[in-house]
Amino acid sequence: MAKHDLSDATLPDFKALEAECMSIVLQNGKVPETRAAILPLLKKASIDGREAALRHLTTNGSGLECAGMISNLQDNLITLVHRMVTQAVYPTTQQEFAVAAVGGYGRSTLAPGSDIDLLFLLSVKAGADARKAVEFLLYILWDLGFKVGHATRLVEECIRLSRTDMTIRTAILETRFICGEALLVGELQKRFDAEVVEKTAPEFIAAKLAERDERHRKAGDTRYLVEPNVKEGKGGLRDLHTLFWIAKYYYRISDPADLVKLGVLSRQEWRMFQKSDDFLWAVRCHMHFATGKPEERLSFDLQPEIARNLGYNARPGLSEVERFMKHYFHVAKNVGDLTRIVCASLEDKQAKAAPGLTAAIGRFAHRPRRIPGTPEFIEDRGRIALSGPDIFKRDPINIMRFFHVADLHGLEFHPDALKAITRCLPLIDHDFRENEEANRLFLSILTSKRDPALMLTRMNEAGVLGKFIPDFGRIVSMMQFNMYHHYTVDEHLIRSVGILAEVDQGQHADIHPLAVKLMPNIEERTVLFVAVLLHDIAKGRQEDHSIAGAKVARRLCPRLGLNDKQTELVVWLIDQHLLMSMVAQTRDLHDRKTITDFAEKVQSLDRLRMLLVLTVCDIRAVGPGVWNGWKGQLLRTLYYETELLLSGGFSESPRKERAKQAAEQLAEALSDWSQKDQKTYTKLHYQPYLLTVPLEDQVRHAHFIRQADKADQALATMVRTHSFHAITEITVLAPDHPRLLSIIAGACAAAGANIADAQIFTTSDGRALDTILINREFPIDEDEMRRANTISKMIEDVLAGKKRLPEVIATRTKGRKRNKTFTVKPHVTISNSLSNKFTVIEIECLDRIGLLAEVTAVLADLSLDIHSARITTFGEKVIDTFYVIDLVGQKITNENRQGSISVRLKAVMSEQPDELREQMPSGIIAPAATKSPAAEKKARV
């Protein structure tokens, strides 16, 4: 790549610096004293030069120029030290070695925190002093704080090693002379070209592409990860470097601009190359300057600062960081386009390679063949290719036919064909979009029984999807600045379609069995595929994306060929696509009002089935680890309860009668107990417990409570884990207390456990039976049970007063550092319409360790009795819902009291000073010496 010239004004005065350093060297005869004397001068020059580069980056914005300035600065420093060494310290070595830059430094670009890769080339006549001179130079660089990757070799050694070591071969490919004996570097480059590069291009290209694929696999094989690696990630700088290495090796060029002269890239594509390279270098340089280290991962905490430094401003619906990251992913996509274009050109050159018997046999064996019924396309080694150069210009609809034929025949894509499509994107105009055949073919691709996600991905990468559906084009490369969504919006939508296709094919029944079971019964399969593709299409707008997306669907669906009924169903699904997820995760599914309200919105079993499948696809496509068995269980519970109501099977028998029947069933399940024990332990529970807790859990609880009573334990815990549900259950038996849930939550926080749900019940003898569900951490049950026992021990120790809650919480981090990057405005909603019996309090704020403990402590301090709680985390944001009543069992209807509750909760969520938090109770509720109620009764007798 071209070297970046700098005016003398931008760098320190190296002539004056050299004169001063040379004077010091001549005055000091000893090497150590010489190094120590000149080091401060060189260090100041290095600092001043890098500060100048940062100023230039800030004012000019060019990343390549900044990287070029730092490279030039480094050249000057190395040249200066080399002159001192060879002229004053080891004067006999002037013609015995050369210093060359390799790697990225060899391209005359250097990031602020990057290593300096040097090759010291020795003459065959070099003596011991030459190696001492190299050592002197290296010590200076190390003393200056640089990380130096280096090798000292003869030209012959370089040639020999590069034949077998692809890393060394790549480094030598980019060798650039800095100072010393230039003839040595010239000899290396000449011999390398003749003895190594000649006739080995296919081998080198294959190795570099395999290396790239492995790098992508390690970094995350998508260019749309929302915390990308700017250097190593897909669509990053290393991909551009690989492209240049391949082009330089194959075409024997020294400047990427020569690819235009060779006809590999158009002028427009070359400008894309330059802009992409410059942008990625700007981002990388800013990252290094901001962190003071070679940071390559564009993490959430860095993104806002880099966005500001690059001058991005917020626009309606998109913050400045979201606009910056959209640009970043757009550039990453362009890098992918350029890679395809160059690979297509290389393959074309290979196909026209040297004649001969072997080549002829190879071409015959892989001779392209016609695809029946499609004269426009041919199959070339399992890939769809074009039968002529003007296929798309003659009939633009061939662009859509291309993807449809590839899907029908299960073909991959020839890079030359994709390059042609990219260059013909202007043909996808209004007439194309309104063409009936184009829309029919697209719908066939979307609803394919094969791999629609792959086709959509290729269409998206080629730019076709965004041109064909302009509203989709608006969300291409769009990221959402939060810790919940792992991918850009377009990637999320395509992954959602891929998961729907898997469900449609009956795959992963172990992960989401209900969705797989329901899919064959969904009549409007096409509607579901369209809804899944479009459900987030209106992200990034001022209007709620569900509402705006429904409007987009109402316009688009008729164009795709859907009738009025199908269109309205797609519109409803998009408008309500978050409903089932939010109800399942934030509402008490054992509260009948939850089910009746949800059923009233859904209205039909067909809608219910489709909404369930859409919800599963949406959550699973958010990112790794977001879907788990617990969420699946919540969705299944909501589905089955609603299905029962919509199908007319919801029981209307009196609550009291149903509770009586439940108690009788429990007694029957305990038939091997004495009648006295049966009566005692069935009468412990009130109606809410009997009507909501499954019978098998009631039986477990009965055994648990009786065992605690026999052991005279006032405080006891029981644990079990569910690998399928991905949760671990901790049941706590303790004397009832207003702050019990708060203290349990605090103990869980201290143990590092994330509470997913809480069921709270009071027994007739004044005890609390609380069941806490925490997210699993380990896949193996034995490991998870050890963790669960540790957490339950922490709960017991805190409740028994063996450990003080404020102290154990203080041992944990004060909060997740990454969360501090985000802003979630604290919000409190208090509703009396979501439950017939309870007031529902919902809070939304930034998540942090110990938050639930503090919130529940506030509710207890406000004399509110928590019946149940739902704790839901969306990345950095938490939505906690509490079903509460006052101390006399009534809803909270007084507006003034609701206002005071809201104020107190917002103060805690905002981490404002609060007396309650300062005076948090030690946690003593059930001292170890306290006897159980049964034991006390026995003692009185």
Swiss-Prot record:
Catalytic activity: [protein-PII]-L-tyrosine + UTP = [protein-PII]-uridylyl-L-tyrosine + diphosphate; [protein-PII]-uridylyl-L-tyrosine + H2O = [protein-PII]-L-tyrosine + UMP + H(+)
EC number, UniProt record: 2.7.7.59, 3.1.4.-
Residue ranges, annotated region (Disordered): 916-941
Keyword hit for Hydrolase: yes
Cofactor: Mg(2+)
GO BP: any one term: regulation of nitrogen utilization
Keywords: Hydrolase, Magnesium, Multifunctional enzyme, Nucleotidyltransferase, Repeat, Transferase
Source domain of life: Bacteria
Alphabetical list of InterPro entries matching this protein: ACT-like_dom_sf (IPR045865), ACT_dom (IPR002912), HD/PDEase_dom (IPR003607), HD_domain (IPR006674), NT_sf (IPR043519), PII_UdlTrfase/GS_AdlTrfase (IPR013546), Polymerase_NTP_transf_dom (IPR002934), UTase/UR (IPR010043)
Region described as Uridylyl-removing: spans on this chain: 373-728
Domain HD: 489-611
Keyword Magnesium carried by entry: yes
Activity control, per UniProt: Uridylyltransferase (UTase) activity is inhibited by glutamine, while glutamine activates uridylyl-removing (UR) activity.
GO molecular function, one term: [protein-PII] uridylyltransferase activity
Domain ACT: 729-810, 840-919
PROSITE patterns listed in its UniProt record: ACT (PS51671), HD (PS51831)
Annotated region (Uridylyltransferase), positions in chain: 1-372
Protein's job: Modifies, by uridylylation and deuridylylation, the PII regulatory proteins (GlnB and homologs), in response to the nitrogen status of the cell that GlnD senses through the glutamine level. Under low glutamine levels, catalyzes the conversion of the PII proteins and UTP to PII-UMP and PPi, while under higher glutamine levels, GlnD hydrolyzes PII-UMP to PII and UMP (deuridylylation). Thus, controls uridylylation state and activity of the PII proteins, and plays an important role in the regulation of nitrogen assimilation and metabolism.
HAMAP family: PII_uridylyl_transf (MF_00277)
Domain characteristics, as noted in the entry: Has four distinct domains: an N-terminal nucleotidyltransferase (NT) domain responsible for UTase activity, a central HD domain that encodes UR activity, and two C-terminal ACT domains that seem to have a role in glutamine sensing.
Family: Belongs to the GlnD family.
Protein name per Swiss-Prot or TrEMBL: Bifunctional uridylyltransferase/uridylyl-removing enzyme
